[in-house]
Design a protein with these regions (language model features):
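Alpha/beta catalytic cores of nucleotide-metabolism and tRNA/nucleoside-modifying enzymes
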Residues: 76-97, 101, 107-162
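Active-site beta-loop-alpha junctions enriched in small/polar residues
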Residues: 26-32, 52-56, 105-107, 128
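Generic structural signal for well-ordered alpha-helices
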Residues: 9-13, 35-39, 89, 112, ...
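Glycine/Thr-rich beta-alpha phosphate-binding loop at enzyme active sites
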Residues: 37-98
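Non-catalytic positions within long, well-ordered alpha-helices that form the structural scaffold/packing
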Residues: 16, 42-43, 116
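Short, small-residue-biased leader/transition segments that mark boundaries at the very start
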Residues: 1-8
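Short beta-strand/loop segments at the ligand-binding rim of alpha/beta enzyme cores
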Residues: 18-29, 94-103
Length: 162
């Protein structure tokens, strides 16, 4: 991650010089120390970080004795990556002062709440939208209901509580 951290720093610095508006830097999970990279981009002027992207994966067709994907490896996303994503959001949220946008495997309101409790300021939904186009509405409804049931006045009270 150290070499990649330097790349993130240089790219963030260059973008910040050219772009005065809000800059959200998306971080890859395919690193050993995502928190240090988040700190580096924060120091170079990122307004927020977004994590995670897909994990590198591979599948083998045992009958054909070759990789399933023509590219051999590919991006793993959806519910399978959620535990990794929540951990990385938790690590980054503890390390930076800028907002953290959590994503990776969010299918339900409870999933979104896990990210918020781990420190995410906001969440992003991808794969679930293909399954249920109304996922965003379902998540908002769940969060509102959860807050009512638990006497929470504002969702931000739950941010980073774990």
């Amino acid at each position: 991650s150290r070499g990649l951290g330097d790349v993130y720093k240089r790219q963030t610095r260059a973008c910040r010089r050219a772009w005065p508006r809000t800059m959200i830097v998306k971080l890859s999970p395919n690193v050993t120390d995502i928190a240090s990279i988040a700190c580096a981009v924060e120091a170079e002027g990122a307004d927020s970080v977004s994590l995670i992207n897909t994990l590198l994966g591979m599948a083998v067709d045992v009958e054909r004795q070759r990789p399933v994907l023509s590219t051999v490896t590919g991006g793993l996303s959806g519910p399978a990556v959620k535990p990794v994503a929540v951990r990385m959001v938790w690590q980054v949220a503890k390390a930076v002062k800028i907002p953290v946008i959590g994503l990776g495997g969010i299918m339900t309101g409870a999933d979104a709440l896990e990210f918020i409790m781990a420190g995410a300021t906001a969440v992003q939904v991808g794969t679930a939208n293909f399954v249920h186009p109304d996922t965003g509405t379902r998540i908002v409804d769940y969060l509102q209901d959860y807050c009512l049931r638990h006497g929470v006045a504002d969702i931000s009270e739950l941010r980073g509580i774990v």
